[in-house]
Amino acid sequence: LAALVAVQPDAALAQIKKTGASAKKEDVNRRRDDGSTPLMLAVYNGDVAEAKRLLRAGADVKITSKYGATAMGLAAETGNTEMIRVLLEVGADPDSPNPDGMTALQAVARTGNVDAAEALLRAGAAVDAKEKFGGQTALMWASARRHPEMMRLLIAKGADVNAASTDRNYQRHVTAEGRPKSLDSGGLTPLLYAARENCSACAMVLLENRADIDLPDPDGVSPLLVAIMNANWDLARQFIEAGADVNHWDIYGETPLTTAIDLRNRIDGGHASIDPLNKATGLAIVKLLLERGANPNMQFFFKPANVRGAMTTRGVTPLIRAVFNNDSEVVKLLLEKGADATIYTADRQTPIHAAIAGRAPEPQAIELIKLLQKAGTDVNVIALVNHPEEIRGGTALHYAVRKREKEVIKLLVSFGVDMNAVDQDGLTALDYTQSRGFMPFMALQTPLYKDEAALLRELGATRLMDKSPTWPVLGPPQGIWEDIWPLGESAVHEPVYKHD
């Protein structure tokens, strides 16, 4: 080149310009270690002027990094309308899916930038494209991120309001680990996302555009049930008044009524924080559900995976849950609306068992027992052993003795409880006062209850086992599957599992 400059300076200059231009063109598309380009960096930083300069210099808008990122995808993630328009003008793909299939429109939908979404849609972006992992659409993303105006735009452009994300259908049990798995199963609709995120405005947009109000997830959970699970009473009222099925149950048999009863007066915590702006109350929703025809005698098919604590076994009714929660107001309401106080669970626990085993202090338990006995609950039903719940069963008297509630004992005797009835371990209530029972939750034998023993004998109890049982160190054996989940007619009250 130096020799050429000395002999033909004009030719040398031309060659320098040509080489420089070539170098410059190659430079604007140079790759970093991750495969990204200067254009991608400019887009990521929102530097429109730099992006335009690079594009004029020949930057390739369609280059993909090693991780599948594109300039358009990066612009969409930030919802940069001007940048998106610049890229579209030079031929960028309006969909620009990443390796997971997420499109630019889906990314923009998450930001809520309606202008950016309009630009992509005008350029031909697919409104109902689904990403590969979750099968979610732009409308689902907009609903999940609480962007009702974005949802209006997408629906106006033809988005499917009833589309569902991928049902992953995870295996719920494996050979080596038999407990139920709490896994995100997918299968959510835009309305389910709105309910999950407590977005009333999003729900209204969908309902105005004829979204199916009862379309559930793969576990049978409806939008109404989700709203109640979140203790979002206002949204629950909105769904009920819009015509939601108040008797829609999930795969466990859990209904909006049972869930509302639990969440209005939940004893074990763990539920969503209640919006202080909620105008409706849990009690108002319970009343509204009953007014709209909710079945007060609906029972659990199985113990729900998302409900903790005792009295959550098969056959549990709304009444039993309300009693266990010491919610006398709802108990009275349910009885007025036709709740059957004679129905018991698959392990034969009655509402009176629930009153004693629940969280009610003794005075409140007594009031509940009086209500239930008047409504027909039999004090002599013998509950069965339930291993998962760590319950040894027995009559209501067995339960009262184990809790050492003397006034409850007197009340039950006045109601005609059989003082000499035996539980499945062959023990009477009097046996329990003699340290012959077993407390599974503590893995200990029951202590000696002298005062309760004296009271029972005074009231007429006479029967004792001939000899105290010898319990294994860890307590009674766990039993076979039929013992754990009793299925026989002898274990199931006739009305159990009859669902309207």
Please provide the spans of the model-predicted regions:
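Bacterial N-terminal signal peptides
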Residues: L1-A6
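Ankyrin-repeat-protein effector appendages
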Residues: Q15-G20, K24-D27, D34, K157, ...
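N-terminal segments that cap or nucleate solenoid repeat domains
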Residues: Q15-I63
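Ankyrin repeat domain, specifically the short helix-to-loop turn at the C-terminus of the second helix
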Residues: S22-E26, K52-D60, R85-D93, E118-A126, ...
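Ankyrin repeat A-helix N-terminal signature
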Residues: L41-D47, L74-N80, A107-N113, W141-H147, ...
